[in-house]
């Protein structure tokens, strides 16, 4: 029993043990089953993932096939483009060859033309020789006829006087005488035979002469025919040469045009090829990335296979002792570490899925095809274009998501613009339409893993080749706006001079690379060594893969930068931009902008809690809209611009130490580059300080960081006074460099954009100045431009963009069009905008910028106006509407806060409807120089009239020339210690309806001038110096004879005498009040300035010589006179009237003005009337100054229209003065008269004033210039010559008679179809002239008549007849005819007939003179008065003068002992005319000479400065040469005495200026 119990007890214990083991086994089996279920579920999920991966691989393969197909298409299009390029090159070579052939043909034709011209010259020479031979033959024929007549008369006389004498001697018985009839018959037979023989002889001679004459006529006709044929051939050859020249010009223009066209097409195709190559390279890189990712996926799959094998081994190794230990670890370790490996692989798969988003983008290829197809379809593709084609910006890119269709890609934007969309908010990115002259900055954003999967991997390649093309078409422009949306910054790189500094911590990099991975030290450690080693291998592979990716990207960057450097070396470097990378905190948004010039002192401020960037920016760009809306910064942007940084920083050679200039005004020159490194927490920050070349763009979208950013200490740049001027000047100078060939129009706009924010701390503002330089064409389709070709000036319009679209409190800067169309190429406009200084004091919505305008023009006029909007009536607004995508701007009449009333502000509001509204406040301030009184004219007119003129003069004084200052100083001096005093009395002020203001003032000026201050030798500098010296000598002589008291100054209180010179000859300096020219403001009004003055001064005799270069005035202090001047300025012309009256001891002065509307008579005074009219279409200056000595009776009669009746008065001087105003005519008349005691004078003048008297000298010069008439001039110089009669006529319309006086008158009148009229002298002549050219002569003993007849019409026919008669007692006067003359004994007659027709240029002249005399007179030529010159004393010399190409031949005799010169001025034609007149007190003595015709050519000179004005139609001027080449030859055919010689003088066509101060007196 006991054994059984023991046995059963042991069994029971065993059963209990077995039950416990069974329970444990069942629990273990259940647990393993649960684990198996989990493993099966995991395997099923892995299999489903592999299935999805296989599907993705199929999609990848499909898209790769499509990409290959597109690549093939691109290769085919590239081959086609190359074929077209080769065809164009061949065509260009063909055109060049044709151009060479055309040049060869032209040279051959030029040679032929030269040969024909030489033949023509030879034919002309032969014709001249034949004509000379003909003349000689005719002369010989006349001589033979005369000899024949003499012989006939001799024979007749001999026959008549024939007598016979007979003598007979009767030595023998006388023979029977012959019969008388036989003797008579024999003699008759003898005489008849001799008569027949002589008649036969003479008939033979006459027949021979007739035959010779016939042959001469035939030869002459033949020569004329040959000359005519040669002329026709020459004309045909000339026309042919002209046609060939035109053809050559057309061919050259066509060649240039086709060359430009083909060059543009080649550039466009090369651009397309470059873009396609860039896309190909981008595809290659993308495919390499895909392969690399595929390799990584294979590695991950291998790792998963190893894990599956590990689990399988765990299942099979249940009996292994390590199971217990592994189980305990499983039970103790929490669930979270086990999911770490799952999350790791999940993140890896997520990264792969994100990269799988790439093949979904196919729109860039359509855009590329569109761009390549639209290159030839753009309407302005041959014009000046501006397109920025981004080259390699798509190498890494073509960046978009599956929602890239939401990014607008229109035909007016750049076809290859990169738009980045975020899958988190699906907001498209607006492209940047800025004019980026350099390449876009490369931006890389390392991917992240956030809760929202599928964020695009945005790798934007740097655009290395920035192809800039000129485009007038406003579309097809856009730029790469590469932004990235990311939540955490990854690693950061700062690039300096091609080096990359990469500071990062491993754990930080891991954390940045995947935002969800957390690798903790308590990671799951596998029990098995295999599992642990596998896990470590996976981690190492991941880490090494990250480093390998970074190294690959870095190597790609280096390759790209090397390629960019090569591209920069190949083309001219126009990039002045330095893109600088930004460091922005995690919650902020990064904006990358490319600028041209920056202001100094930009620094990145680093903080441990975050990174912010502050900027002081100066942008030099065109129409750059802010890209703030396109860059939503949830990531860190990495900007790399090594090549441009290297290119610009190579120029920096100065020393460090320029950081302290941060508070100075922005400089436009790069001075120094500094580099600093700041160690941070887990990273190293490198700072580059490039003064004036760096720009940091501040992101203000993050409101949380903006408060801190604006409240911390920011240095504020202040611009005031000279610093602003210096900065603007440097900007303008820098902008104008390299643009000498263009219109230099520079618009500089300075916009201060306040980053105002109501924060808790101190608020400072960074002030970026935006200066925009106007280029020739617009760079963007939305910043629109109008270019007007008519004036050569580019008018720029600046569009505007809201700075932020999502932040209602952000600063909204805008640029309005404030450019006004100017009228000069050299205009420079400055646009200055300054904001409110304290914008934090009012609402944020009312913040904005104020736009000022500074116009600096060539006339030193500054218009300075503050504007925030465009006034409707002043500025033009150019808006494209919805086509350019610009929002309409509406003007809201809402007043805004302005500082001091001088600054307005413009405000833009973003309303709910999306419309951009503007709140304008316009305050203008204009400062005009040199008319500053325009700004305060109200204050001037509000004062008393007595002080108005002085205030106006004070305002004008700084900008006037020195000479005007000196003259105006006499009106403004009021001190008593000076030698003169002035009193200004403004009588009345009148305002006319046309906007002109007449200010009538009386200025009483008395001043004593020392003789040492104004020396008489100053007049020698004038062009009429010799005349003035002669005039002054006469004045000195006349003053020396007069016992006048020492002049006194009437206003001197003490009455002391004025210091006198030797002969009391004093100069009184006249003060002329210069009125400013008519000034036009914007409304077109003319600034009024008008004055009258009456001057009292010790003046009685005044010498005023007006020359083309200036005024020289000298006054003789003798008496008190009065000067009245009236100056009135109207809107369209300036009229200046001067009435200067100088009184002297004269008996009576009577003056009648030209229009007979005014007659003034006074005792002891003479008048001087000056009319000066200055207008846009006419400039008339009429000056007449008359000075008198002791004149008993004086009378003036003027006539401007038609001559009045003849006035004959003994003891009276009659002269006329008048003006001839025209529509466009310049009239200058000057008369200077010096007279001593005058007994009596008489003269009648025409349109110009003349005067003569005994014992006085008068010089009168009248100049008249018209637009088509050239110069018209009249010069009279009268010397004291008794017993002479001077007469002259003008236009053959009036009669001039004067007795007992002598006058030498030279008048030069140049009109389009009327040559010069000359006047001569004849004593004791009574002449009546009418328009019919009828001449009546009443002669008595000793009468000489000279007649000049000029007829002018279209054919320019001139007839001139000179008739000189010397009637002796007992001889009746002969009637004068045109064809024949009957000359009685002791009567000499000279006829000159000059006729110039359309085909005959050389007139024929005949002189027949009666008896030899020793003194001669001058016969004026038909074109100009000849210069008479010679060297023999007492001998009469016939002078032969040839007048250039169109010769006027005449022969005259003159006595070289009595020669006077009269100077005349033809300033506009560039030469001077001098005429010589010969006069003698006794009378005229005409030399006897034969008719002489010498055809002379060549170049010669006359001794002296005699100039001739022969030309045709009053334009051609021929001058004498300065050197003397006088050839004397004895005329063999002269009948005169041996003293008679022939002087040949040649006139060439040189127009030379006569040396100043050399007169023939």
UniProtKB/Swiss-Prot annotation:
GO terms for molecular function: intermediate filament binding; protein-macromolecule adaptor activity; structural constituent of cytoskeleton; structural constituent of muscle; vinculin binding. Gene3D superfamilies: 1.20.5.170, Vasodilator-stimulated phosphoprotein. Residues 371-390, 401-421, 625-637, 1086-1099 have a biased composition (Polar residues). The keyword Phosphoprotein applies. Keywords: Cell junction, Coiled coil, Cytoplasm, Cytoskeleton, Intermediate filament, Methylation, Phosphoprotein. Residues 1-10 are annotated as: Head. Residues 11-49 are annotated as: Coil 1A. Induction: Up-regulated in reactive astrocytes following neurotrauma (at protein level). Residues 11-322 form the IF rod domain. Its main location: cytoplasm. GO terms for cellular component: adherens junction; costamere; intermediate filament; membrane; neurofilament cytoskeleton; sarcolemma; Z disc. Type-VI intermediate filament (IF) which plays an important cytoskeletal role within the muscle cell cytoskeleton. It forms heteromeric IFs with desmin and/or vimentin, and via its interaction with cytoskeletal proteins alpha-dystrobrevin, dystrophin, talin-1, utrophin and vinculin, is able to link these heteromeric IFs to adherens-type junctions, such as to the costameres, neuromuscular junctions, and myotendinous junctions within striated muscle cells. Belongs to the intermediate filament family. Interacts with DES, DMD, DTNA, TLN1, UTRN and VCL. Isoform 1 and isoform 2 interact with GFAP and VIM. This is Synemin. It comes from Mus musculus. The lineage of its organism: Eukaryota, Metazoa, Chordata, Craniata, Vertebrata. The gene is Synm.
């Amino acid at each position: 029993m006991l054994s059984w119990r023991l046995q059963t007890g042991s069994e029971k214990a065993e059963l209990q043990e077995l039950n416990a083991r069974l329970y444990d086994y069942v629990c273990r089996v259940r647990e393993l089953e649960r684990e198996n279920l989990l493993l099966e579920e995991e395997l099923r999920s892995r299999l489903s993932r592999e299935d999805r991966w296989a599907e993705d691989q199929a999609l990848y393969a499909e898209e790769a096939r499509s990409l290959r197909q597109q690549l093939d298409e691109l290769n085919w299009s590239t081959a086609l483009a190359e074929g077209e390029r080769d065809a164009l090159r061949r065509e260009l070579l063909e055109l060049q060859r044709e151009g060479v052939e055309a040049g060869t043909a032209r040279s051959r034709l030029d040679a032929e033309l030269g040969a024909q011209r030489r033949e023509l010259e030879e034919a002309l020479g032969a014709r001249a020789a034949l004509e000379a031979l003909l003349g000689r033959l005719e002369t010989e024929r006349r001589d033979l006829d005369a000899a024949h007549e003499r012989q006939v008369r001799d024979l007749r006389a001999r026959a008549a006087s024939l007598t016979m004498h007979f003598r007979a001697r009767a030595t023998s018985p006388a023979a029977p005488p012959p019969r008388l009839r036989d003797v008579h018959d024999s003699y008759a037979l003898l005489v008849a035979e001799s008569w027949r023989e002589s008649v036969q002889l003479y008939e033979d001679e006459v027949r021979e002469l007739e035959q010779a004459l016939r042959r001469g006529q035939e030869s002459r006709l033949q020569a004329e025919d040959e000359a005519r044929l040669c002329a026709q051939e020459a004309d045909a050859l000339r026309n042919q040469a002209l046609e060939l020249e035109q053809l050559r010009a057309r061919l050259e223009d066509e060649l240039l045009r086709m060359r430009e066209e083909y060059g543009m097409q080649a550039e466009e195709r090369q651009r397309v090829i470059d873009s396609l190559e860039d896309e190909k390279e981008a595809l290659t890189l993308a495919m390499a990335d895909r392969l690399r990712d595929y390799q990584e996926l294979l590695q991950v799959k291998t790792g998963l296979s190893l894990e599956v094998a590990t689990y399988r081994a765990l299942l099979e190794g249940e009996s292994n002792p390590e199971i217990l230990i592994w189980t305990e670890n499983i039970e103790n370790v929490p669930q979270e570490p086990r999911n770490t490996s799952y999350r790791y692989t999940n993140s890896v798969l997520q990264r792969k899925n994100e990269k799988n988003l790439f093949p979904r983008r196919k729109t860039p290829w359509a855009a590329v095809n569109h761009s390549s197809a639209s290159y030839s379809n753009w309407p302005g593709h041959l014009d000046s274009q501006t397109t920025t084609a981004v080259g390699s910006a798509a190498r890494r890119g073509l960046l978009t998501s599956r929602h890239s269709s939401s990014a607008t890609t229109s035909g007016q934007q750049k076809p290859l613009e990169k738009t980045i969309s975020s899958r988190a908010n699906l907001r498209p990115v607006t492209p940047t339409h800025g004019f980026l002259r350099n390449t876009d900055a490369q931006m890389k954003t390392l991917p992240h893993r956030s809760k929202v999967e599928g964020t695009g991997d945005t790798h934007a390649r740097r655009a290395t080749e920035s192809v800039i093309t000129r485009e007038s078409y406003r579309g097809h422009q856009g730029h790469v706006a590469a932004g990235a949306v990311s939540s955490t910054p990854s690693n950061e790189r700062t690039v300096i001079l091609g080096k990359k500094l990469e500071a990062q911590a491993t754990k930080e990099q891991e954390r940045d690379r995947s935002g969800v991975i957390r690798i903790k030290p308590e990671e799951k450690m596998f029990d098995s060594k295999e599992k642990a080693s596998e896990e470590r291998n996976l981690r190492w592979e991941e880490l090494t893969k990250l480093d390998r990716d970074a190294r690959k990207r870095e190597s790609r960057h280096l390759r790209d930068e090397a390629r960019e450097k090569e591209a920069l070396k190949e083309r001219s470097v126009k990039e002045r931009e330095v893109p600088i990378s930004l460091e922005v905190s995690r919650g902020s948004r990064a904006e990358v902008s490319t600028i041209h010039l920056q202001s100094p002192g930009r620094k990145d401020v680093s903080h441990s809690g975050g990174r912010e960037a502050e900027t002081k920016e100066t942008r030099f760009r065109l129409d750059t809209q802010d890209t703030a809306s396109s860059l939503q910064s949830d990531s860190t942007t990495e900007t790399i611009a090594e090549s441009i940084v290297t290119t610009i920083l190579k120029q920096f050679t100065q020393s460090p130490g320029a950081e302290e200039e941060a508070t100075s005004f922005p400089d436009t020159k790069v001075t120094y580059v500094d580099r600093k490194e700041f160690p941070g927490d887990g990273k190293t920050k490198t700072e580059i300080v490039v003064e004036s070349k760096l720009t940091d763009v501040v992101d203000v979208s993050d409101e949380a960081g903006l408060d801190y950013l604006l409240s911390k200490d920011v240095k504020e740049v202040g611009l005031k006074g000279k610093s602003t001027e210096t900065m603007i000047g440097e900007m303008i100078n820098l902008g104008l460099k390299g643009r000498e060939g263009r219109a230099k129009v520079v618009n500089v706009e300075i916009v201060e954009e306040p980053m105002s924010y109501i924060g808790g701390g101190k608020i400072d503002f960074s002030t970026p100045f935006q200066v925009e330089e106007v280029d020739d064409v617009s760079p963007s389709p939305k910043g629109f431009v109008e270019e007007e070709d008519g004036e050569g000036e580019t008018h720029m319009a600046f569009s505007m963009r809201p700075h932020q679209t999502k932040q209602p409190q952000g600063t909204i800067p805008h640029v309005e069009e404030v450019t006004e169309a100017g009228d000069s190429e050299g205009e420079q406009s400055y646009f200055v905008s300054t904001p409110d200084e304290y914008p934090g004091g009012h609402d944020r919505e009312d913040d904005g910028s104020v736009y000022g305008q500074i116009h600096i023009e060539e006339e030193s006029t500054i218009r300075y106006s503050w504007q925030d909007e465009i006034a409707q009536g002043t500025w033009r607004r150019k808006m494209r509407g919805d086509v350019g995508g610009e929002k309409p701007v509406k003007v809201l009449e809402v007043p805004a806060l302005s500082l001091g009333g001088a600054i307005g502000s413009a405000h833009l509001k973003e309303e709910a409807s999306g419309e951009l509204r503007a709140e304008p406040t316009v305050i203008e301030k204009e400062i005009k120089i040199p008319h500053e009184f325009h700004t305060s004219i109200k204050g001037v007119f509000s004062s008393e009239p007595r002080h108005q003129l002085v205030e106006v003069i004070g305002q004008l004084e700084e900008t006037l020339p020195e000479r005007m200052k000196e003259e105006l100083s006499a009106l403004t001096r009021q001190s008593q210690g000076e030698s003169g005093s002035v009193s200004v009395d403004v009588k009345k002020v009148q305002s006319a309806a046309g906007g002109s203001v007449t200010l009538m003032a009386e200025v009483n000026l008395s001043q004593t001038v020392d003789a040492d201050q104004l020396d008489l030798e100053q007049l020698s500098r004038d062009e009429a110096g010799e005349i003035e010296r002669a005039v002054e000598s006469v004045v000195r002589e006349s003053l020396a004879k007069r016992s006048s008291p020492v002049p006194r100054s009437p206003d001197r209180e003490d009455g002391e005498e004025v210091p006198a010179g030797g002969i009391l000859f004093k100069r009184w300096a006249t003060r002329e009040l210069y009125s400013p020219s008519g000034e036009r403001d914007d409304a077109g009004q003319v600034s009024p300035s008008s004055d009258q003055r009456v001057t009292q001064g010790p003046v009685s005799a005044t010498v005023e010589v007006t020359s083309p270069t200036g005024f020289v005035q000298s006054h003789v202090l003798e008496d008190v006179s009065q000067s009245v001047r009236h100056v009135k300025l109207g809107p369209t012309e300036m009229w200046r009237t001067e009435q200067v009256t100088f009184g002297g001891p004269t008996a009576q002065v009577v003056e009648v003005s030209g229009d007979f509307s005014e007659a003034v008579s006074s005792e002891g005074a003479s008048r001087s009337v000056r009319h000066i009219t200055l207008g846009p279409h006419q400039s008339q200056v009429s000056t007449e100054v008359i000075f008198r000595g002791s004149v008993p009776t004086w009378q003036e009669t003027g006539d401007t229209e038609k001559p009045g009746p003849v006035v004959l008065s003994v003891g009276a001087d009659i002269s006329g003065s008048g003006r001839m105003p025209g529509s466009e005519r310049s009239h200058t008349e000057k008369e200077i008269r010096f007279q001593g005691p005058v007994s009596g004078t008489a003269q009648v003048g025409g349109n110009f004033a003349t005067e003569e008297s005994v014992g006085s000298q008068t010089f009168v010069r009248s100049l008249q210039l018209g637009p088509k008439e050239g110069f018209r001039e009249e010069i009279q110089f009268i010397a004291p010559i008794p017993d002479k009669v001077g007469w002259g006529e003008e236009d053959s319309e009036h009669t001039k008679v004067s007795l007992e006086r002598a006058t030498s008158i030279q008048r030069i009148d140049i009109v389009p179809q009327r040559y010069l009229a000359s006047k001569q002298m004849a004593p004791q002549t009574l002449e009546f002239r009418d328009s019919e050219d009828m001449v009546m002569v009443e002669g008595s003993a000793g009468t000489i008549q000279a007649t000049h007849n000029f007829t002018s019409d279209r054919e320019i026919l001139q007839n001139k007849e000179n008739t000189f008669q010397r009637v002796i007692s007992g001889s009746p006067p002969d009637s004068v005819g045109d064809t024949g003359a009957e000359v009685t004994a002791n009567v000499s007659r000279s006829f000159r007939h000059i006729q110039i027709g359309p085909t005959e240029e050389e007139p024929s002249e005949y002189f027949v003179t009666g008896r030899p005399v020793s003194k001669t007179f001058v016969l004026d030529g038909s074109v100009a008065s000849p210069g008479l010159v010679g060297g023999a004393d007492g001998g009469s010399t016939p002078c032969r003068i040839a007048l250039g190409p169109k010769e006027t031949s005449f022969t005259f005799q003159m006595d070289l002992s009595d020669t006077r010169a009269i100077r005349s001025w033809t300033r506009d034609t560039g030469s001077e005319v001098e005429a010589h007149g010969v006069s003698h007190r006794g009378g005229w003595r005409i030399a006897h000479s034969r008719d002489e015709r010498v055809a002379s050519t060549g170049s010669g000179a006359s001794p002296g400065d005699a100039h001739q004005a022969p030309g045709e139609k009053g334009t051609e001027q021929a001058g004498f040469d300065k050197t003397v080449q006088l050839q004397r030859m004895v005329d063999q055919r002269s009948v005169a005495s041996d003293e008679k010689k022939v002087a040949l003088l040649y006139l060439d066509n040189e127009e030379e200026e006569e040396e100043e101060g050399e007169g023939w007196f």
